[in-house]
Amino acid sequence: HRTVLSAIRKRSVAGKIEITVDGLVGDDQGDKTNHGGIDQAVYLYSSEDYFWWSGQLNYVLPPASFGENLTLSSFGKNPVRVGDRFRIGEVLLEATGPRIPCSKLATTMGDPEFVVRFEKAARPGVYTRVLKPGFLQKGEIVEQIFGSMDAPTVPEVMRLYGAKKPAPEELRQALRAPLAVRTRTRLEHKLAIINQGTD
């Protein structure tokens, strides 16, 4: 699948942007406890999902409303799975899971119920780790390289993350994928609780 990188977070950028294993150079996270890290180094969102949200909210959201580092034109017809990769110029990214919404997103949107809306919408964007650093710029072609079809989709991981009684086999299958550490820890904890109840 091929799509187009359409914008870069926060401001219009002329020229090339450097991406390292820590993310975009010059683009830091304010809350490093819950955001960022090498397996959540670059957060992708799509213009297609922005268009959907504009229809739901009846107004046009400004760029980077969801805190993404890079905005793609589309994620394509098939949901992104954990382990799928994105080649953007010389940069190679690997999907590690969804953005888990928090109160900061609700504050940004001016809607105390927006976290619930975001979860129900199942359009969480995609956290990625940087497998190959390099430079990119607006307008680059994006090539999606599909990973294992056994891996969970990113929306499925978000559902498992918030589920009160997730199916243990779904958790086990998700944990076989290259998840971000914070998400992996949460799902491992859920599975441990289930296993304790069956001992």
Predicted regions located by residue number:
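Acidic, Mg2+-coordinating catalytic module of metal-dependent nucleases/exonucleases
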Residues: 143
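Electropositive, beta-rich accessory/interaction domains or terminal extensions
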Residues: 1-106, 113-114, 146-199
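Short loop/turn positions at the edges of beta-strands in beta-sheet-rich folds
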Residues: 74-76, 122, 132
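Loop/turn positions that initiate beta-strands
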Residues: 83, 133, 138-140
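A mid-sequence, solvent-exposed acidic-amphipathic segment
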Residues: 112-130
